[in-house]
Amino acid sequence: MAQKDMQDFDKIIVLDYGSQYNQLITRRIREFGIFSELLPNTTTAAEIKKIAPKGIIFSGGPMSVYDGGAFSVDPEIFELGIPILGICYGMQLISFKNGGNVEASTEREYGKAEITVTDKDSDLFKGLPEKQTVWMSHGDKVTAIPEGYVTVAESDNTPFTAIENRDKHIYGIQFHTEVQNTEFGNDILKNFAFGVCGAQDNWTMNDFIDMQIEKIREQVGDKKVLLGLSGGVDSSVVGVLLHRAIGDQLVSIFVDHGLLRKGEVEQVMESLGGKFGLNIIQVDAKERFMSKLAGVSDPEKKRKIIGNEFIQVFDEEATKLNGIDFLAQGTLYTDIIESGTSTATTIKSHHNVGGLPEDMQFSLIEPLNTLFKDEVRDLGEKLGMPYELVWRQPFPGPGLGIRVLGEVTEDKLKIVRDSDLILREEFALAGLDKTVWQYFTVLPGIRSVGVMGDGRTYDYTVGIRAVNSIDGMTADFSRIPWDILQKVSVRIVNEVDHVNRIVYDITSKPPSTVEWE
């Protein structure tokens, strides 16, 4: 059977106009089984023609289409005959470029709004209720639609909430289908993707695995690849995927800096080195890191010390190896998007990964750079990786070094390790380990008076942090049931030495960050 490539899959591309929800649009389309990618708004009609997508989506954005310097579009894209859906700014751009009118709205709409579908023959709203709740986020609105377009939905403040040109298959909606607050958002996107574009849901993770293995083998040949294992999800999945493709041509370096979670070193070595057979060079650098951190309390100094020391250790080990031609990284699609939707930009900015010396010339392999985080977890499961590795909590590069506020000592690290394990165990028992985006314990360095048994104590406070987020840019504290928090609290106080008080962090991001340091 012939090997599949990207030309074998239907695609819908999203042009990036700066919306905070851009990644969500792409993810929603992929969830339908259709491959989707985010491209710069400067992408030309000729470039799109080569990609041959089934559909094009113009995203939302913060600009006003009538301002000088506003993001625009190659007008030839409207003549390709490929269905187009404009969302928010995208709809305004379609109207503006085709003879309609867009003005600043006297009443801005941010948040939930009620719309009414006014055309029962609408392609976008086919099979959906007349009244719907949607999520608006706009300060401009269309005040006159182009010739050939019809209005298919309206709201009290926005008479042209959705428009269609069925002859040219060009559509616009003023609200955001991609966010959960839009009641029938997925259905509208499905009507566009399947009904209008005629796309097939033929994109699967198993196809991705087969294509990546073939691609890696072609790229690497008989040469060797170096991977820095952190114990996190991304590098672990990269390791297993590469090993399946090229076996022992992959050499991994795992630096134990003494700032990992309880049982993490053993789990990585037993699972990746044992079950999956990765060739792992384990470096015990605990004493080296702790000696450098002694007496240091400033969080930025701690980060720099940990980062620089990690680079140095990795460099020392890498220079001992001969015949390495490739460096593998766990770069995700989100990293590329945040670098300006440009793969070339990302490769350049990440090329000297970990501060590797300039004379160590590696070619870069980034097998996950078209995937989102949730897709990486799906990939890990398809590769047969254990639940504990695939669903491991996000973990900062400096590790527990920034979850111990102030000076890092072995005693303080033990408190964080033990309390964090209890939190993870109880969240797993309660089924919260997949529903809460990130959760961990932190040692603020606060000591307070308590009573345990018949005696007075003066011990540490442990903080619990649990948040929900989509992309980490903003986050809201999780509403954890009190009985679960109480159980965690009782266990930590009883099972972890030198702790007599537990607090729960109920601040969101912003104003706080997810991590305390």
From Swiss-Prot:
Q: In which pathway does it act?
A: Purine metabolism; GMP biosynthesis; GMP from XMP (L-Gln route): step 1/1
InterPro entries xrefs:
Class_I_gatase-like, GATASE, GMP_synth_C, GMP_synth_GATase, GMP_synthase, GMPS_ATP_PPase_dom, NAD/GMP_synthase, Rossmann-like_a/b/a_fold
Q: Which reactions appear under catalytic activity for this entry? A: XMP + L-glutamine + ATP + H2O = GMP + L-glutamate + AMP + diphosphate + 2 H(+)
Please list the coiled coil stretches.
none
MF terms (GO), sorted A to Z: ATP binding; GMP synthase activity
In this chain the Glutamine amidotransferase type-1 domain maps to 11-202
Q: Which Pfam families match?
A: GATase, GMP_synt_C, NAD_synthase
Residues annotated as transmembrane: none
Q: Which domain of life is it from?
A: Bacteria
- Which EC class heads this enzyme's classification? ligase
Alphabetical keyword list? ATP-binding, Glutamine amidotransferase, GMP biosynthesis, Ligase, Nucleotide-binding, Purine biosynthesis
Any one GO CC term of this protein is:
cytosol
Q: What is its EC number?
A: 6.3.5.2
Job of this protein = Catalyzes the synthesis of GMP from XMP.
Quaternary structure note: Homodimer.
Its protein name is GMP synthase [glutamine-hydrolyzing]
Protein's gene: guaA
